[in-house]
Curated annotation (Swiss-Prot):
This is Ribosome maturation factor RimP. The gene is rimP. The keyword Ligase does not apply. It comes from the Bacteria. It comes from Histophilus somni (strain 129Pt) (Haemophilus somnus). One of its GO terms (cellular component) is cytosol. It is found in: Cytoplasm. Belongs to the RimP family. Pfam families: DUF150_C, RimP_N. HAMAP family: RimP. Keywords: Cytoplasm, Ribosome biogenesis. One of its GO terms (biological process) is ribosomal small subunit assembly. Required for maturation of 30S ribosomal subunits.
Length: 153
């Protein structure tokens, strides 16, 4: 069964691409009676500007008003992924092999939900993180949330 995020990705991706941006990912979050739809956009040829976010917000709002895929009232947020960019797809993870990432699991592994380490490799939906000099194999489907850990020199 497709999630709301999957449905929104399919619905909104063409509109975002028409504006010269990539739809990096979508988060839907409920906090009390408020519902937030957060879109992360990126550009291959440089950084995302405030104008890019405003243009995407206007375009996406129009599509959502017509298609009406969200039953509740919601707030729409559009931003760049930022330095600690969230990772949503295996392809995105592949781009960060050799870098530190932080992962939150749906179901604990070895009594831990939170893991941080160097992403060593990806094979058959399995990610290998080096944590405290030990390889830890995580199942992609068990990842609730993941982010790149920025390095500051």
């Amino acid at each position: 069964m497709a999630t709301l995020e999957d449905k929104l990705q399919e619905l909104l991706q063409p509109s975002v691409e028409d504006l010269g941006c990539e739809l990096w990912g979508i988060e839907c979050q409920r906090s009390g009676r408020f519902f937030t739809v957060r879109l992360y956009i990126d550009k291959k040829d440089g950084g995302v500007t405030v104008d890019d976010c405003a243009d995407v917000s206007r375009q996406v709002s129009a599509v959502l008003d017509v298609e009406d895929p969200i039953a509740d009232k919601y707030n729409l947020e559009v931003s760049s992924p930022g330095l600690n960019r969230p990772l949503f797809t295996l392809k995105q993870f592949e781009n960060y092999i050799g870098q530190d990432i932080s992962v939150h699991l749906r179901v604990p592994m070895l009594d831990r939900r939170k893991w941080q380490g160097k992403l060593e490799k990806i094979e058959n939906d399995m990610l290998t993180l080096i944590v405290d000099n030990q390889p830890q194999v995580l199942v992609f489907g068990n990842i609730q949330k993941a982010n790149v850990v920025p390095k500051f020199n």
